[in-house]
A protein has these predicted regions:
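Pore-lining transmembrane helices
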Residues: 1-51, 58-266
Length: 268
């Protein structure tokens, strides 16, 4: 669902092109919002115009004036600001020590499990994909991918290791959670988190944070913003591939054991 529908296409496309000149992913994201909401603003400003101008509104007023608004803001404000931010972020990443990278990786990995597809999850993902697209650094992309894969894998492992603590209906989702986890689809754990939020989220955040931190400790880099285990063949080195899997396995096992232990036996 778009913000402004068809009239927002041209200013949105221009915002994306201008962002590619240095403002990067986040600059393009903000430019898209500016394009969409500028059309909405123009619609409100012209709503009292005579109906005979309706054709001109959609053909001339909305696309041209929204393009002017978006272009001016992108050229004079968004572009320069986010170009500078991208330079700062690139320098910061290049000078970041291992300890700081591990800490940030753990935070990002943990955030992926806090709300499993919600705004906190999306904030961590947006930061990492922004760094990935603007600096070609896939380190934090590996952290969020590992962290996001842990919850469904942990649930599936808990059902495997603690069979007496899950009823038959819950056990039916074991295979699907394995598949979703390996595919980096965190939302597979949501039904369990909805039933027992503190136990599920608490246990998953621990393992996801550990997985995210370990990817940074071992210098893992992801070659794509999504894909789970399917990105492994494209990883830059065998080292990254091996320790990406090891990081996820450690995090999932820790979370799965914690959840299985604290859940207790199911009620009959």
């Amino acid at each position: 669902m778009s913000i402004a529908d068809k009239p927002g296409f041209m200013p949105g496309a221009v915002a994306g092109y201008m962002a590619s000149q240095g403002a990067g992913f986040l600059g393009g994201l903000i430019g898209g919002f500016i394009a969409g909401y500028s059309v909405i603003f123009l619609k409100k400003m012209t709503k009292n115009m005579s109906k005979q101008f309706d054709g001109m509104k959609s053909m001339v007023i909305y696309p041209i004036f929204s393009l002017l608004i978006t272009g001016v803001l992108m050229y004079f404000i968004i572009g320069p600001v986010f170009t500078k931010i991208n330079v700062i972020v690139a320098n910061w990443l290049n000078n970041m020590g291992t300890a700081n990278a591990v800490l940030l990786g753990a935070v990002l990995g943990g955030m992926m499990s806090v709300d499993m597809g919600g705004p906190i999850n999306k904030a961590a993902y947006a930061f990492s994909i922004g760094v990935f697209t603007d600096t070609n650094n896939g380190a934090f992309m590996a952290a969020v991918m590992a962290g996001g894969m842990v919850p469904p894998l942990a649930i599936a492992l808990a059902m495997t290791l603690f069979k007496d603590r899950f009823d038959e209906k819950e056990q039916q989702s074991k295979i699907s959670n394995f598949i979703l986890g390996l595919s980096f689809i965190t939302e597979g754990a949501i039904p369990f988190a909805a039933k027992e939020p503190l136990k599920v989220i608490g246990s998953c955040v621990v393992g996801a944070a550990i997985a995210g931190g370990l990817t940074q400790f071992w210098g893992v880099s992801a070659p794509a913003p999504h894909g789970g285990i399917f990105v492994i063949p494209a990883m830059p080195s065998v080292h990254s591939a091996i320790f990406f899997v090891v990081s996820i396995a450690i995090g999932a096992i820790i979370s799965g054991v914690i959840f299985g232990v604290i859940r207790g036996k199911k009620n009959n």
